[in-house]
Amino acid sequence: MKDGFIKVAACSPKVVLADPKANADAIIAALHRAAAHGVRLAAFPELAMTGYTCGDLFMHELLLDSVETELLRIARETANLRLAAVIGAPIRCADKLYNCAVVISRGVILAVVPKAHMPNYGEFYELRHFAVPSRTELGSAAPYIDSLQTFFNPDGCIFSCTDYPDFRFGIEICEDLWVASPPSDKLAAAGALIIVNCSAGDEIIGKADYRKRITEVQSAKNICAYLYCGAGEGESTSDMVFSGHCFAYENGTLLAEKAPFDYANDMLITEIDLGRLLYDRRRVNSFCAGNAAHSGLFVDFSLGFGSCGPAPHEDLPETELTRRFPRNPFVPHDENELNARAKDILTIQALGLKRRLEHTHSMSAVIGISGGLDSALALLAAAKACDLMGIDRKFVHAVTMPCFGTTEHTKQNAVALCNSLGVTLHTIPIADSVRSHFRDIGHDETCHNVVYENAQARMRTLVLMDLANALNGLVVGTGDLSELALGWATYNGDHMSMYGVNAGIPKTLIKYVVRYYARHCENPALHDTLTAILETPISPELLPADEKGNIAQKTEDLVGPYELHDFFLYYVLRWGCPPAKLFRIAKQAFRESEFSNETILKWLKNFYRRFFNQQFKRNCLPDGPKVGSVCLSPRGDWRMPSDAVQRLWADEIQKLS
């Protein structure tokens, strides 16, 4: 439960039709197994106590009496488990029979929640046996079921853990999800962070994917987690087959899935990040948490971690993480999705630049080309902008400006790239200009300090700006999102342009966009050049090459691996992760990588230090298009004072090991 992680389970054990005792035995065994794994919330299918396909046997008192007896036994025999269980069962109330979910925790039946919408079409005929909950018949107060010693609430409940108040869940049953206005809408708006669905939907061709798509959208629009548990083996196959399909979504992202017909596996276990959900609800001010009318019960329960009220953070158990955290969160895992995203990124860049060029009546686009990844992507976007405007690519003026650290390899790549794309190429050596500047300010050329490096960067920007004036053009910036986060840019040097097309794209994603273009360009020379650029170490080339003429100054040796920094950037900006939680997630994500825990912590410290110290550069960024959900534009997504102090974050990092 530390860091906001709650372990949940969807359990679909083999059901024995019309035998509540046998089913209770299976449920008790499953709950003990789940508790051994640290599960805090366990869900079972719709009508799990009897099976969904009992037919007219649901009307028999003997069956219903047994259900109540066995529910009380489940409560007794799981009283020492620190979890809440949601179990489907037929329940009598006020002379009617209802299809319900029964919530049990620490030996107590907390409440009974009835299904709100009864399907009575196609293969379903639930109205034959079950009533629709109605306030007209039940009255304004929640009825009390003496035999179960608990309340029956037709308007649903929100269950809140007093030990950890962020742990709040609501329930809907099968068909409730499929209607135009599901109960989960109001439950989420009133504060529920997890929705449990006890289901018994039969399996037909295409239904599993459709079911997932509906759940994906429901969890995304309600900024909640959704735990779906479907009935499976043991149900009657007279007319239908039940697959035991179970899965969990978190804010539109699939966390885990037990595939349909996987009867050998009767339990799905994963972790839900409540902190992530809360952060997004606070961030999205249009989400109406706490403001929606909810007439149901708010039921408190304790898992025994706090003596009275919320437990101190140090007393909460640490949830073992099994969920997957991608090492490259900006990069889709699926190749088709990655290709589609790369195509969209290039289009966004090109359209943004096209609009700016047209608005300023520019006669050219001027770009500094280094032979590296960032300038290559900026040039590709500029070439595409020309194509969209229906003009010759000669409109783009690419400028190489070799100096002290330029290698023959990168210079050749830059020239080959420009020739392959058909843009106008300028080569303007700047070494003499920089030496003249050194003489003007009294700097020794043999002193390779920050003056030596930044003078070259600013000279390149000066050349680009003046050339743009001469050509009635606009300087296109090449700096990327990762560099902006770290402040890895010379202030008023490569930091400055007239429109930055790469400002919303992290370094780890840029290489995949360039790779996509290389694979789909149908130009062998361009493909080979882009491939060579992809294989070149990332470097500003501001220090002299080594004795073999190779790049000596490698960015990742100085500021750290971009794979780590982009990981940090994503979780800090997108989900507001504090350092301790971020370090924990990073260790999980990179546990099978070349990065040790010590290495991760080293660069995590560096990331926070640079992120805070370099905000002054971000606060005066040129315009540039937003591309993804993480962006650092001071006019949009990230507004932070340049003199904000990082002490709180630094102190937390200091405690890590």
PLM features: residue spans?
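Enzyme catalytic cores with a strong preference for nitrogen-chemistry domains
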Residues: 1-366, 384-393, 425
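ATP/NTP-dependent adenylation/nucleotidyl-transfer catalytic domains that generate, transfer
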Residues: 23, 165, 223-224, 233-236, ...
